[in-house]
C-alpha cells in the first residue's frame, strides 16, 4: 500500500507537486487510500525510524566523545532582559563571553573601553554624530590599538566598527554593564596554586581575582594545591576561567617556538626546491634573524 501510494503520488504530482496548474481535485476514494497508507504499520514504522535516525544524527553533531552536550550552555545568565537594539547586542556579547567563561575579563576590558570613549574629548560625540563613517572607523581602530583586548572584546569592537553601528557602541557597553551587574552577588571560585599559600599570599591573589567582578559580589574561595603548575595560579568559576600558571605559559612558548621553527624549515625547503636563496633575502632576515632590540 505504502509503495503504491508513493509511486502514484509522485507520478501524478497531486500530493507533492508545488505547481498549481497540475493540481487536480482529490476524490473521496483517493483520500481514503491516503489515510490508509498513513495509518499503515509500515508507514508508522518508517516515520519512527526516520525520527530516530534524525535524533541520532543531531546527537552526534551536538555532543562530544563522552556524550556530553556541547550546545547546552553551562555559563551565566543575566537576571534582566534588555530588548532595545543596544540591549540585544549586549545580550549577544554577554552570551559569547559566558560561553567562554570570560565575562569577568570582558567586563573589565570593556569598562576600560567605555572610560576611554567617555573621557576622550569629542570621541563620544564624534561616534554618535554625522561625520563620515571612514573617520569614525579610524578613531575606533586607534582605540583598539591602544588597549589589549581578549577575542570576545576585540570582535565586539570589530563588528560594531565594520557594521557601522557607531551610535550603538556606547549604549551597548552601558547595557552590557547592566547585565553583568544583574548577576548573583555570591560567587564560588576555585583557585589552583602551586603550593600551600600563606594568608598574605591568599589576600594578594584574592584581591587580584576580585578586580574582575562587580563590587557588590560576595566571594567564596576554595583552594587546590597542584605542584605541577610550578608557579602562578588557575581561576575556575562560572564567571571567569583563567590559567595564569607557569607550566601553561611554558607550553604556549614551546608551541610557538615549534610553529616558528616549522615555518622556518618549510621556507628553507621551498627555497631549495625552487632553487631560490630565500635565506639571503631581506624578508627572510627580518622574519627570522632580526634581533629584538628591546632586549638590548
UniProtKB/Swiss-Prot annotation:
The record's Gene Ontology cellular component field reads: mitochondrial inner membrane; phagocytic vesicle
On the tree of life, the source organism's domain of life is Eukaryota
**Where does it localize?**
Mitochondrion; Mitochondrion inner membrane
Q: What is its main location?
A: mitochondrion
InterPro entries recorded for this chain? ATP_synth_OSCP/delta_N_sf (IPR026015), ATPase_OSCP/dsu (IPR000711)
**GO molecular function (one):** proton-transporting ATP synthase activity, rotational mechanism
- Name the Pfam families for this protein: OSCP
Which SUPFAM superfamilies does this chain map to? N-terminal domain of the delta subunit of the F1F0-ATP synthase
One of the GO BP terms on file: proton motive force-driven mitochondrial ATP synthesis
Mind listing the UniProt keywords for this protein, alphabetically? ATP synthesis, Hydrogen ion transport, Ion transport, Membrane, Mitochondrion, Mitochondrion inner membrane, Transit peptide, Transport
Q: Quaternary arrangement and interactors, per the entry? A: Component of the ATP synthase complex composed at least of ATP5F1A/subunit alpha, ATP5F1B/subunit beta, ATP5MC1/subunit c (homooctomer), MT-ATP6/subunit a, MT-ATP8/subunit 8, ATP5ME/subunit e, ATP5MF/subunit f, ATP5MG/subunit g, ATP5MK/subunit k, ATP5MJ/subunit j, ATP5F1C/subunit gamma, ATP5F1D/subunit delta, ATP5F1E/subunit epsilon, ATP5PF/subunit F6, ATP5PB/subunit b, ATP5PD/subunit d, ATP5PO/subunit OSCP.
Per its UniProt record, what PANTHER family does this chain match?
Answer: ATP SYNTHASE DELTA CHAIN (PTHR11910)
Its family remark reads: Belongs to the ATPase delta chain family.
Q: Function of this protein?
A: Subunit OSCP, of the mitochondrial membrane ATP synthase complex (F(1)F(0) ATP synthase or Complex V) that produces ATP from ADP in the presence of a proton gradient across the membrane which is generated by electron transport complexes of the respiratory chain. ATP synthase complex consist of a soluble F(1) head domain - the catalytic core - and a membrane F(1) domain - the membrane proton channel. These two domains are linked by a central stalk rotating inside the F(1) region and a stationary peripheral stalk.
Q: What is this protein's record name?
A: ATP synthase peripheral stalk subunit OSCP, mitochondrial
Amino acid at each position: 500500500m505504502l509503495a503504491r501510494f508513493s509511486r502514484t503520488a509522485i507520478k501524478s504530482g497531486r500530493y507533492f507537486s508545488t505547481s498549481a496548474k497540475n493540481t487536480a481535485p482529490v476524490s473521496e476514494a483517493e483520500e481514503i487510500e491516503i489515510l490508509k497508507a498513513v495509518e499503515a504499520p509500515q508507514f508508522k514504522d518508517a516515520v519512527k525510524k526516520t525520527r530516530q535516525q534524525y535524533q541520532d544524527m543531531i546527537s552526534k553533531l551536538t555532543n562530544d566523545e563522552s556524550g556530553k552536550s556541547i550546545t547546552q550552555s553551562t555559563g551565566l545568565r543575566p537576571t534582566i532582559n534588555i530588548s532595545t537594539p543596544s540591549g540585544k547586542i549586549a545580550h549577544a556579547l554577554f552570551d559569547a563571553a559566558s560561553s567562554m567563561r570570560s565575562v569577568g575579563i570582558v567586563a573589565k576590558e570593556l569598562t576600560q573601553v567605555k572610560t576611554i570613549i567617555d573621557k576622550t574629548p569629542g570621541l563620544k560625540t564624534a561616534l554618535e554624530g554625522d561625520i563620515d563613517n571612514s573617520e569614525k572607523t579610524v578613531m575606533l581602530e586607534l582605540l583598539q590599538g591602544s588597549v589589549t583586548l581578549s577575542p570576545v572584546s576585540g570582535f565586539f569592537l570589530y563588528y560594531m566598527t565594520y557594521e557601522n553601528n557607531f551610535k550603538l557602541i556606547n549604549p551597548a557597553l552601558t547595557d552590557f554593564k547592566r547585565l553583568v551587574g544583574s548577576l548573583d552577588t555570591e560567587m564560588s571560585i576555585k583557585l589552583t596554586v602551586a603550593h600551600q599559600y600563606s594568608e598574605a599570599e591568599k589576600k594578594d591573589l584574592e584581591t587580584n581575582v576580585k578586580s574582575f567582578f562587580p563590587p557588590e559580589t560576595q566571594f567564596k574561595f576554595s583552594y587546590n594545591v597542584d605542584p605541577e603548575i610550578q608557579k602562578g595560579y588557575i581561576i575556575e568559576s562560572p564567571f571567569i576561567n583563567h590559567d595564569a600558571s607557569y607550566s601553561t605559559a611554558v607550553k604556549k612558548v614551546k608551541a610557538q617556538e615549534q610553529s616558528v621553527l616549522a615555518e622556518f624549515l618549510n621556507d628553507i625547503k621551498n627555497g631549495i626546491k625552487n632553487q631560490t636563496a630565500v635565506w639571503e633575502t631581506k624578508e627572510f632576515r627580518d622574519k627570522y634573524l632580526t634581533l629584538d632590540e628591546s632586549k638590548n
